[in-house]
Every structure is written in C-alpha cells, then in structure tokens.
Amino acid sequence: MHQRLLIVLICVVLLTGSAFGITTGTPHKKRHRIAHATATAVKASVAFAPKLIGVRTKKRVALPLVDPTAGDSVDGEDLMARRAAVQALGPQSGAVIVADPNTGRILSVVNQKLAYQGAYEPCSTIKIVAALAGLNEGIINQEAAFKLKKRHSIDLTEAIAHSNNAYFATVGEQLGYDKIVQYGQMFGLGEKAGLNIDSEQPGLIAEAPPSDGLGMMTSFGEGFYMTPMELAAIVSAVANGGTLYYLQHPSSQTEIDQFVPQVKRQLNGAQWLTNLKPGMMGAVEYGTARRAGFSATEPIFGKTGTCTDNRSATHLGWFGSYNEVGDRKLVVVVLLTSGAHSVSGPIASGVAGAVYKNLTGENYFAQAAPQASPAALISNHVSY
C-alpha cells in the first residue's frame, strides 16, 4: 500500500513539475550547447546552398550547388588569370571578368553566360559615371566639400570611398535626367561592350526617370540595367585615362597573336578621371571595399555596389576594380547574385582581392605586359 502511494506521489510531482516548467532531464545550458553544435554542423554542410524566397515549405531542403564555370569556353583564355578567378569565386553564384584595360582584351571570364547576358541594376557602381558627370558639368570638384542636409559636408573622395548615397543623389538631381542618360551612354551603358561575342546581350536604360526621383539613378543605379561586361568596359576606361575599348575575347592562339585593340570612343571629360582615383583607393584602404585588401605597393582602386534588382528581386553584390603594379594594370570585375541577403559589394570586393592576391602569388605581374597594337590609335571612334 505504501509503495503504491509513493509511486503515485512521484508521478504527480513529475507531471506537476512539467506543467510549471520544471525539468529533470539535461540542464538548459547543456541542451543549448548540444543543439548549437548540431546546428553548426548542419549549417557547414550547406553553407553555399541558396535559399528559397517566397515559398512556404514544411521542410527546408538544401539545393544542389551550381558550378559557375559550367558551360564556359576556355579556348584562348589566359589560364593563369582564369585559375586565379575560379579559385577566388569558389562555389558562390556569380561571375568574374579579368581584362587588360590598355587593350580591351579579356583575359578570362568565369560564368560566361551571366557575364554576357546578366543585366542587373548597377547599384552604387553607377557613382563612377555620376562622379565624372558632376565634375565635367561643374557641379562638384574634388577638393570642395559638398553641403548636404543637417549641415553635414563631404568631399568627392570620401563620398566615393564610403559610397555616400545622399552626395550622389544630390549630384543626380542637379544633373537632370537627360545628362544622366547622356553620360551613361557615353560610358557604354545600354549597348554591347564586347566585339564579336555572339552570346552577349546589352543592358538597357529606362526611357523615363524613376518614380522615386533622379537621385535614385545616381546613387543606386535605378533605371539602368548593366552587365558585368559593361562594368568591365567602364572600369577599363577609368583605368587607362579615358579610352572606351570594345572588349574582345580571343578564342584561339591565332586570335591572340593577331589581336588588334578596337576603340569605341574617347570619353568627354577624361581629364577629370584622375580625381576619382583617391576615392576608389580610399574605398579599398578604409571604405566599403576593405575586404579587397589594401597594399601600398600594389594598390587596388575600386567601387562597390549593393542593392536588390527591381525586376528580378535578386540581391546583388558588385565590385568594379583595377590595380597598378609597376607599369601594369589589370581590371577585375565581380558580380555576385543571390535570392537571399547573403551577397554585397564588400563581399564581391573580397573576391576581387583574392584574384589579385592569387595572381601576385603566381608572380603574374612580373611578366612582360602584352603590348598594344598601333592600330588602336587609328581605330574609328566617337567622342561624346
């Protein structure tokens, strides 16, 4: 009888304790450590799996990785540049272009379909175009601080380095829609950047200003849709001092041997391009592109871009850059895409920085640079 009563009392205590949150099993902190370890292990196994957006599912499924190099043709590519780019991009969804800004020759394109056909909003990389437009139209200059709201002032160098949206929105409002489009077209936006690349598709420029103001065009790139090829051409023109080359991708050793640079046009206001360099270097040294890795002996100049594409809801991470090693320059452009908030311009800058680092490790920049053909000087071009 006493034994039965004891058993009943124990059961009552257990049930009552459970109801009031009293536990008799594994302590909470220990259970948390076990759960955390398990979650970390699971997360590590699907670290690069994209997330589903807008779909309700009872069970999360890790999607298989897509090889960004699948379908690429490596014929005629600089294999050292390609190896550096492939290793830097890894399994991330995106594209990398490596090019010679002094000739327009493409050395490697990783994920060629995205690089040739992926037209997205340029995000803050449009500030390169806006900066030159503002300088050439006399709206801004490099030294003078630009007064913004709340008595805050900022100069061009800091505005580029920190990608200040208010600064460039003000520039856009003063430029007006027609001037913004004019300078965008001068840099090659809305047209093919490459020459004789059959699969390439051009970006586009909206026929009307954004409904939320001109400032969105020059701070976030709203109204423009740009391919990685177009950004590579833009950065190449900045790097070489104002010559917009057609980008060419040789597909054989014969085409490499017979390569002749082709000029599309000379930029109007090219004399102002040197004013962009301190800000583009500052972005890498202390601004939005710090992940690229600053080096005083092998400086990188770049501009990040982070936004969500209005048409596709794709999250974007852009980085357009070039470096200087002695008398050599190399352009590296990165576009990262994702269905989730897992990409950004700073992350893209880290990919580009890894490309440069990989090439330095291969002693790439100690090799003789390919010489530009004199034919480039007599190619037909149009000035804006």
Spans of model-derived segments:
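Second-shell loop/turn segments in exported
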Residues: 67-76, 113-120, 145-149, 153-158, ...
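Sec-dependent N-terminal signal peptides
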Residues: 1-23
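Active-site-adjacent helix/loop patches that line small-molecule binding or acyl-intermediate pockets
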Residues: 94, 145-232, 240
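Extracytoplasmic/secreted envelope proteins and their assembly/folding machinery
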Residues: 78, 82-86, 126, 156-160, ...
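Active-site SXXK
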Residues: 85-89, 104, 118-143, 159, ...
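Conserved active-site-proximal loop/helix segments of enzymes involved in bacterial cell-wall
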Residues: 142-164, 232-290, 363-384
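Beta-lactamase-like hydrolase cores
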Residues: 42-100, 189
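Active-site beta-strand/loop architecture of penicillin-binding DD-peptidases
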Residues: 215-250, 255-262, 286-366
